[in-house]
Regions:
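Active-site-proximal loop and beta-strand segments within enzyme catalytic domains
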Residues: 1-147
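Short, charged N-terminal helix-start/capping segments
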Residues: 72-74, 79-81, 155, 164-169
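Internal, well-ordered alpha-helical segments in soluble enzyme and binding-protein domains
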Residues: 127, 131, 151-154, 171
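Hydrophobic (often cysteine-bearing) scaffold residues that line and stabilize catalytic clefts
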Residues: 4, 9, 147, 151, ...
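Generic preference for hydrophobic/aromatic residues in regular secondary structure cores
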Residues: 135, 151, 179-182
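Short, well-structured active-site flanking segments
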Residues: 14-33, 162-182
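Active-site-proximal alpha-helical segments within enzyme catalytic domains
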Residues: 48-51, 151-161
Length: 182
């Protein structure tokens, strides 16, 4: 995910900046109506890029996708046992036999499942709105450097709002296809 921040989101933001379609001093709320009447309405594009927006470092969105009754014990923990053997990080192991909430994920693209998250895995389109709601409701701290995934999720939304395309489609059209990288 950190690589995507610099090779995808940042690339798109730089292009839109060069084209005069956004300014670093613009509040993200200019492009994201969900932020307008919140404590996040004045967060600027620059603050998001520099991780100085006051946003929380991360939100565990996956928790909203997991059927809590399909998990034995906690979903993640710091050691391997018979239920937790999928390594997610250096000291983090996930429950390996969980199930997604009913209707949230599909093996094929459908009118409701439009967000591709992996080959053969499509997420319900409403999950993106639920993620934004979690961001809007999250705490906002003092504006100082705190590495945050949330800022780059918002930058992705800004790019998509300006271009009218998904970040993936915009990058393919503006960068990858012209460079012969499809």
């Amino acid at each position: 995910a950190s690589l995507t921040k610099t090779t995808a989101t940042l690339l798109a933001v730089m292009k839109l900046y060069d084209q005069g379609q956004l300014k670093l001093t613009d509040p993200a709320s200019k492009y994201l109506p969900a932020l307008r009447n919140t404590n996040k309405k004045n967060i600027t594009i620059r603050e998001l890029l520099l991780h100085e927006s006051g946003l929380v470092p991360y939100i565990r969105f996956y928790r909203n996708a997991i059927d809590e009754y399909s998990v034995t014990g906690p979903f993640t923990q710091g050691f391997v046992d018979e239920w937790h053997h999928t390594r997610m990080g250096e000291y983090t192991y996930a429950c390996s036999d969980f199930k997604f909430r009913r209707g949230l994920v599909s093996a094929t693209k459908t009118p409701e499942h439009t967000l591709k998250i992996a080959d053969g895995m499509w997420l319900h389109r409403k999950f993106k709105a639920a993620m934004m709601k979690s961001i809007v409701q999250s705490e906002l701290a003092r504006k100082r450097f705190v590495y945050s995934d949330i800022g780059f999720i918002l930058l992705q939304q800004v790019v998509e709002s300006i271009t009218g395309q998904t970040l993936d489609a915009y990058l393919v059209a503006e960068f990858y296809r012209p460079m012969g990288l499809e």
